[in-house]
C-alpha cells in the first residue's frame, strides 16, 4: 500500500480476496499514521457503496504497507470528518 495507489486487494478473515478501489489516502500528524479509504469494486455501480477505512504504515521503501484496523473512536471521528470534507469537496467540484 502506498500513497497514490488506485486499487488494492483486501484479503478477509476467510482468505477471500476482494479487489477494492482506493477513494483516497491521507496522513494524520495527530495519530502519526497514514490512512486509506476504499470500497469494493463490485459495489461501484450500486447507488450506495460501503466505504472502508484502515490505517497503514509504509515500509522502508515507502510502499506496500500492511493494513491495520482503526483502533479508537477518536480515530473514527477524525476519519469521518476527513471523509465528509472530501465528499463535500467532490460535490462542489461537480457543480
UniProtKB/Swiss-Prot annotation:
InterPro entries assigned to the protein according to its UniProt record, in alphabetical order:
UPF0473
Supply the NCBIfam families for this chain.
Answer: PRK13678.1-4, PRK13678.2-2, PRK13678.2-4
What's one Pfam family here? DUF1292
Family assignment? Belongs to the UPF0473 family.
- Specify the protein name: UPF0473 protein BPUM_2377
Amino acid at each position: 500500500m502506498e500513497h497514490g495507489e488506485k486499487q488494492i486487494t483486501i484479503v478477509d478473515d476467510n482468505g477471500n480476496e476482494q479487489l477494492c478501489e482506493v477513494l483516497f489516502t491521507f496522513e494524520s500528524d495527530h495519530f502519526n499514521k497514514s490512512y486509506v479509504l476504499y470500497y469494493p469494486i463490485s459495489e461501484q455501480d450500486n447507488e450506495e457503496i460501503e466505504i472502508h477505512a484502515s490505517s497503514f504504515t509504509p515500509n522502508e521503501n515507502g510502499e506496500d504497507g500492511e493494513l491495520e484496523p482503526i483502533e479508537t473512536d477518536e480515530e473514527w471521528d477524525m476519519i469521518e470528518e476527513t471523509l465528509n470534507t472530501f465528499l463535500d469537496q467532490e460535490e462542489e467540484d461537480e457543480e
